[in-house]
């Protein structure tokens, strides 16, 4: 039978044993990829600076997912939060990777066994002696088991009752750690940034899944519904499964891109909207304002700003700045961050404090414009010097740094002032090492961007797959040219008027 490549799955259409085999093999491939990818990432990951060179800057993709579920230690003696450890235990990063690879091998062997021994008694219909699957019962079994797993995850793993808990952090991604979470049963549980909602929703959804599974195991579908939804056709299962997968993919693409308690910024990097809304900048200025209200000096209050918070307020960490087809980690783009130079404050010769307008997300170049506290333009770096009125030289702009490596240093040289004004467009100013990785200076996206793009793309593809297979199973008889009234239509003289079923001849 010469099947084209896009129809090869036809061979398992009426073969339950080998249908099971190919699904087990698929699980083996997925699990094997996850374990292998984890080992590769651990081989290239540098845990030495969790503040300025975190996992998301290094382009780690599977390590963040392990970390948010409670894995923080490595057999290499390091912890993701910094420092060294002596007893990481079996459930370290390497332990999880190894477990996936072992599981992959077992699934591989099981798939081969089920491929060879495909003609099992369990798949045989006693009445007909032909291979058959009781799909409604299988649906009930899967619903019950997945509900059990969902409930167990929410009630035991997340709450810490039997498990480590999950990664929980503050709104600014500064104090993150793995901890147990109490379920949030009030309206606050519907806030996507409240970790307690993860526990309560898994418990609730798991309970519903268990009850629904038991219902489908004990109640048979009505005949009309069974036939109407084509419940006896395996392609119905394929269509509805694809629907579940694409719906989940759309949901997680949204929670990843817009941010939620399930996608902490310490593990996946900031969202683009935190740059667009000046989220971290506002918090920095709030802290500075609070310090100044206590009569502390500018140098003191800016020195108290956590380097981690300042680093979030840098456009190079915006996932929307990197092109989708620019391969490599963020570190391969603008370089490895070495240190915060401090916060630059610009002043004109009249002593007014000036603020550099920040570059919007979707600009590659942007004019350097300095405004005062009222938003009035006071200085710029002109495109045409002959017509300039507000150039740094004419206005006499100076810059002084507070906090960071250049604390207390000031510059009045126009070339230096303009250099730092340009860099201030990109947020807080950092020293970046571009030599180590031969970084090219072109911004890259973070794993947050890759995950969103991948899942949104596949969700769209799977949506069309759902429509395709759903239509095939619902209209299978029509596509095959089989119509319930076909025999009556072609019978000579069946209708008084050819093809008009309302004029059926009466038998005398």
Swiss-Prot record:
Cellular component terms (Gene Ontology): chloroplast thylakoid membrane; photosystem II
Role summary: One of the components of the core complex of photosystem II (PSII). It binds chlorophyll and helps catalyze the primary light-induced photochemical processes of PSII. PSII is a light-driven water:plastoquinone oxidoreductase, using light energy to abstract electrons from H(2)O, generating O(2) and a proton gradient subsequently used for ATP formation.
Primary localisation category: plastid
Compartmental location: Plastid, Chloroplast thylakoid membrane
Protein name: Photosystem II CP47 reaction center protein
Keyword Transmembrane (UniProt): yes
Family of this protein: Belongs to the PsbB/PsbC family. PsbB subfamily.
UniProt entry keywords in alphabetical sequence: Chlorophyll, Chloroplast, Chromophore, Membrane, Photosynthesis, Photosystem II, Plastid, Thylakoid, Transmembrane, Transmembrane helix
NCBIfam families tied to this protein: PS_II_CP47
Membrane topology field: Multi-pass membrane protein
Gene name in the database record: psbB
HAMAP family in UniProt: PSII_PsbB_CP47
């Amino acid at each position: 039978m010469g099947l084209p490549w896009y129809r090869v799955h036809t061979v398992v259409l009426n073969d339950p044993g080998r249908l099971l085999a190919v699904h087990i093999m698929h699980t083996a491939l997925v699990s094997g990829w996850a374990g292998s990818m984890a080992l590769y990432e651990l081989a290239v990951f540098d845990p030495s600076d969790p503040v300025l060179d975190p996992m998301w800057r290094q382009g780690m993709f599977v390590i963040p997912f392990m970390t948010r579920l409670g894995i923080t230690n490595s057999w290499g003696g390091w912890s993701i939060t910094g420092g060294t450890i002596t007893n990481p235990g079996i459930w370290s990063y390497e332990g999880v990777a190894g477990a996936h690879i072992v599981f992959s091998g077992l699934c591989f062997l099981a798939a081969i066994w089920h491929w060879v021994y495909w003609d099992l008694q369990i798949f045989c219909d006693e009445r007909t002696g032909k291979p058959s699957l009781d799909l409604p019962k299988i649906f009930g079994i899967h619903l019950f088991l997945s509900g059990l797993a969902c409930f167990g995850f929410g009630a035991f793993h997340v709450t810490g009752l039997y498990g480590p808990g999950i990664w929980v952090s503050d709104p600014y991604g500064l104090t993150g750690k793995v901890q147990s979470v109490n379920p949030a049963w009030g309206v606050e549980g519907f806030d996507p940034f409240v970790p307690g909602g993860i526990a309560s929703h898994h418990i609730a959804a798991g309970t519903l899944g268990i009850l629904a599974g038991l219902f489908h195991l004990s109640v048979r579908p009505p005949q009309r519904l069974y036939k109407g939804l084509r419940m006896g056709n395996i392609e119905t299962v394929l269509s509805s499964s694809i629907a579940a997968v694409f719906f989940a993919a759309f949901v997680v693409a949204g929670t990843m891109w817009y941010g939620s308690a399930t996608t902490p910024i310490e593990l996946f990097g900031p969202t683009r909207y935190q740059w667009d809304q000046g989220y971290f900048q506002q918090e920095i200025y709030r802290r500075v304002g609070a310090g100044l209200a206590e009569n502390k000096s500018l140098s003191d209050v800016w020195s108290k700003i956590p380097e981690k918070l300042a680093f979030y307020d840098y456009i190079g960490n915006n996932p929307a700045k990197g092109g989708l087809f620019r391969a490599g980690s963020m570190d391969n783009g603008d370089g490895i961050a070495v240190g915060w130079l401090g916060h630059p404050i610009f002043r004109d010769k009249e002593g007014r404090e000036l603020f550099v307008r920040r570059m919007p997300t979707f600009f590659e170049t942007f004019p350097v414009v300095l405004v005062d506290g009222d938003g009035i333009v006071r200085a710029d770096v002109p495109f045409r010097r002959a017509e300039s009125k507000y150039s740094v030289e004419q206005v006499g702009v100076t810059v002084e740094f507070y906090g960071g490596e250049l604390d207390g240093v000031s510059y009045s040289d126009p070339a230096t002032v303009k250099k730092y004004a340009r860099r201030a467009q990109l947020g807080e100013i950092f020293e970046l090492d571009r030599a180590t990785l031969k970084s090219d200076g072109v911004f890259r996206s973070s794993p947050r961007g890759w995950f969103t793009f991948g899942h949104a793309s596949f969700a769209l593809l799977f949506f069309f797959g759902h429509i395709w297979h759903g239509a095939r199973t619902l209209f299978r008889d029509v596509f095959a040219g089989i119509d319930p009234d076909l025999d009556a239509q072609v019978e000579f003289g069946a209708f008084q008027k050819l093809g008009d079923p309302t004029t059926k001849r009466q038998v005398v």
